[in-house]
Curated annotation (Swiss-Prot):
Name listed for the protein in its UniProt record: Cyclic pyranopterin monophosphate synthase
Annotated PANTHER family: CYCLIC PYRANOPTERIN MONOPHOSPHATE SYNTHASE, MOLYBDOPTERIN COFACTOR SYNTHESIS PROTEIN A
Reaction catalysis annotation: (8S)-3',8-cyclo-7,8-dihydroguanosine 5'-triphosphate = cyclic pyranopterin phosphate + diphosphate
Organism listed in the record: Desulforapulum autotrophicum (strain ATCC 43914 / DSM 3382 / VKM B-1955 / HRM2)
Function description: Catalyzes the conversion of (8S)-3',8-cyclo-7,8-dihydroguanosine 5'-triphosphate to cyclic pyranopterin monophosphate (cPMP).
Cited InterPro entries: MoaC, MoaC_bact/euk, MoaC_sf, MoCo_biosynth_MoaA/MoaC, Mopterin_CF_biosynth-C_dom
Family: Belongs to the MoaC family.
Pathway(s) it belongs to: Cofactor biosynthesis; molybdopterin biosynthesis
Catalytic residues of the enzyme: D128
Assembly mode: Homohexamer; trimer of dimers.
Its EC number(s): 4.6.1.17
GO process terms (BP): Mo-molybdopterin cofactor biosynthetic process
Residue sites binding substrate per the record: M75, C76, H77, M113, E114
Keyword annotations from UniProtKB, A to Z: Lyase, Molybdenum cofactor biosynthesis
Length: 163
């Protein structure tokens, strides 16, 4: 019926069987951003937010989210991640924080969804902790920056103009 790997011949949803795939090192890096007012950005980096250290809470939330991706996205395989990193890069000229997450493992399926989930939940955590100051924050541009390993090889998003 289709070339979609998560659909069978009758169009029913299924989890892909990865048992026959080779175990390889797989790494994915995702990015996104959250735009805010200058005051909110100053509060975050001045550690002047009532709820606490925003970036450390967002980092922890991102790591936890990467580990729980299979609980959130129905056809994702539960993975034994070996590494998750979440970093933040302030961009005061645009009143935003860039968020980057990396996930890796040695396994039979990729970690793209885990990296994307880490970025998404880190951004949501920043929003949650700062919404009393700035309800107009905008989470955007969440995308896969790169991935390596597996049958499909290497993907680099900068081919498409992403940072």
């Amino acid at each position: 019926m289709t070339d979609f790997t998560h659909l069978d011949d009758q169009g029913r949803v299924r989890m892909v069987d990865v048992a026959g795939k080779d175990v390889t090192r797989r790494v994915a890096i995702a990015r996104g951003r959250i735009d805010m007012t200058a005051d909110t950005l100053d509060r975050i980096f001045g550690r002047n937010v009532k709820k606490g250290n925003v970036l450390e809470a967002a980092r922890i939330a991102g790591v936890m989210a990467a580990k729980r991706t299979a609980d959130l996205i129905p056809m994702c395989h539960p993975l034994n991640l070996t590494h998750v990193r979440v970093d933040f890069f302030p961009d005061p000229g645009h009143n935003r924080i860039e968020i980057e997450a990396e996930a890796s493992l040695a396994g039979r399926t990729g970690v793209e969804m885990e990296a994307l989930t880490a970025v998404s939940v880190a951004a949501l955590t920043i929003y949650d902790m700062c919404k009393s100051y700035d309800k107009g924050m905008i989470i955007s541009d969440i995308h896969l920056k790169s991935k390596t390993g597996g049958k499909s090889g290497t993907f680099l998003a900068d081919r498409y103009g992403h940072p």
